[in-house]
């Protein structure tokens, strides 16, 4: 989040009291929308944890999702080098655009976003009927069975690589990724946790 010093250094005069705000998906990096904040909108955003803009058409504070329920939950806020633009990393609840797309800039989603969406779907499957969902059936079978599937798919992936079968390798790697994501969800972990750990190792 913004530090007190960063807030004091924001150049509101340069932006005539309305600062451009770029909102980016905290996980996928997809640019979701552009809005404007005045000091009051920034204060409310920091207090509520939900992105709030100053609407130039309505001439009032406007919390994204206040009508639709598609809120933008704030992860972090950072100023640019000139202190006249803000970058907000957020986790969206539902589509960001009123047209139903994830981004107000159309279908610009990075391929990595699909993994996040798949992860969300797998989390929802925890409460699904095991009779109607393979994923729910996996969860119901317990951690040992899920871990066994990860092991099996790992071996099959390795075997496909040893015979240089790229088609089969792609299929087996997909199965491995799927079951690994299920195992992470089963253990209360997610891709973000793994990515952060990889970043620490890379430093």
UniProtKB/Swiss-Prot annotation:
Name the record gives this protein: Histidine biosynthesis bifunctional protein HisIE
Single GO biological process annotation from the record: L-histidine biosynthetic process
One GO CC term, this protein: cytosol
UniProt pathway: Amino-acid biosynthesis; L-histidine biosynthesis; L-histidine from 5-phospho-alpha-D-ribose 1-diphosphate: step 2/9; Amino-acid biosynthesis; L-histidine biosynthesis; L-histidine from 5-phospho-alpha-D-ribose 1-diphosphate: step 3/9
Pfam families for this protein: PRA-CH, PRA-PH
Region (Phosphoribosyl-ATP pyrophosphohydrolase) location: 115-203
UniProt region (Phosphoribosyl-AMP cyclohydrolase), positions on chain: 1-114
EC top class, as a word: hydrolase
Subcellular location: Cytoplasm
Assigned keywords, A-Z: Amino-acid biosynthesis, ATP-binding, Cytoplasm, Histidine biosynthesis, Hydrolase, Multifunctional enzyme, Nucleotide-binding
UniProt main location, coarse: cytoplasm
Statement: the UniProt record of this protein carries the keyword Secreted: no
Organism: Escherichia coli (strain K12)
Family, per entry: In the N-terminal section; belongs to the PRA-CH family. In the C-terminal section; belongs to the PRA-PH family.
Annotated GO MF terms: ATP binding; phosphoribosyl-AMP cyclohydrolase activity; phosphoribosyl-ATP diphosphatase activity
Catalysis: reaction(s): 1-(5-phospho-beta-D-ribosyl)-ATP + H2O = 1-(5-phospho-beta-D-ribosyl)-5'-AMP + diphosphate + H(+); 1-(5-phospho-beta-D-ribosyl)-5'-AMP + H2O = 1-(5-phospho-beta-D-ribosyl)-5-[(5-phospho-beta-D-ribosylamino)methylideneamino]imidazole-4-carboxamide
EC number: 3.5.4.19, 3.6.1.31
């Amino acid at each position: 989040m913004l530090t007190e010093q960063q807030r004091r250094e924001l150049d509101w005069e340069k932006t005539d009291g309305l600062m451009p705000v770029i909102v980016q998906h905290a996980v996928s990096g997809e640019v979701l929308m552009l809005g404007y904040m005045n000091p009051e909108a920034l204060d409310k955003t920091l207090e509520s944890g939900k992105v709030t803009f100053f609407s130039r058409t309505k001439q009032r504070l406007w919390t994204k999702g206040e009508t639709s329920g598609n809120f933008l939950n704030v992860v972090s806020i950072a100023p640019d080098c000139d202190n006249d633009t803000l970058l907000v990393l957020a986790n969206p609840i539902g589509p960001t655009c009123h047209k139903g797309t994830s981004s107000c800039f159309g279908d610009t989603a990075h391929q990595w976003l699909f993994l996040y969406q798949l992860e969300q779907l797998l989390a929802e499957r925890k409460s699904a009927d095991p009779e109607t969902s393979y994923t729910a059936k996996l969860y119901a079978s317990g951690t040992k069975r899920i871990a066994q599937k990860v092991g099996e798919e790992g071996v099959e992936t390795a075997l496909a690589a040893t015979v240089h079968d790229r088609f089969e390798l792609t299929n087996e790697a997909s199965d491995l990724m799927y079951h690994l994501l299920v195992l992470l969800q089963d253990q209360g972990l997610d891709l973000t946790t793994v990515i952060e750990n990889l970043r620490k190792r890379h430093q």
